[in-house]
Amino acid sequence: MGSLSIWHWLIVLAVVLVLFVGGGKISTLMGDVARGVKSFKKNMADDETMEGSTGSGGHIAPPGPAAGTVQRDASFSGTGRPSGSSTP
């Protein structure tokens, strides 16, 4: 009980910021953040409408194998021998 928790320190820090920085600057900062979020949402909506108007129909071709990859045979067991062979 003798020490203060993190919540106590955060409240003290908020009070000190309001006293020294002033409430007007904080409200201006919050307004700037709100305008930034609105701008971000608007641009995301514009991007979605641009993608819809490209005429591709929303279909994306499945990717092919990457360059340098090796296709394995389904009967390969990983031991160096085909899975159907028996060892003498």
Swiss-Prot record:
InterPro entries, A to Z: TatA/B/E, TatA/E
Main localization, broad class: membrane
Ranges annotated as spanning the membrane: 4-24
Segments for region (Disordered): 45-88
Biased composition (Low complexity): 75-88
Swiss-Prot/TrEMBL GO biological process terms: protein transport by the Tat complex
GO CC annotation, single: TAT protein transport complex
Record's subcellular location: Cell inner membrane
Keywords: Cell inner membrane, Cell membrane, Membrane, Protein transport, Translocation, Transmembrane, Transmembrane helix, Transport
Function in brief: Part of the twin-arginine translocation (Tat) system that transports large folded proteins containing a characteristic twin-arginine motif in their signal peptide across membranes. TatA could form the protein-conducting channel of the Tat system.
Subunit structure: The Tat system comprises two distinct complexes: a TatABC complex, containing multiple copies of TatA, TatB and TatC subunits, and a separate TatA complex, containing only TatA subunits. Substrates initially bind to the TatABC complex, which probably triggers association of the separate TatA complex to form the active translocon.
Recorded family membership: Belongs to the TatA/E family.
Name under which the protein is recorded: Sec-independent protein translocase protein TatA
Organism of derivation: Gluconacetobacter diazotrophicus (strain ATCC 49037 / DSM 5601 / CCUG 37298 / CIP 103539 / LMG 7603 / PAl5)
Record lineage: Bacteria, Pseudomonadati, Pseudomonadota, Alphaproteobacteria, Acetobacterales
Gene name of the encoded protein: tatA
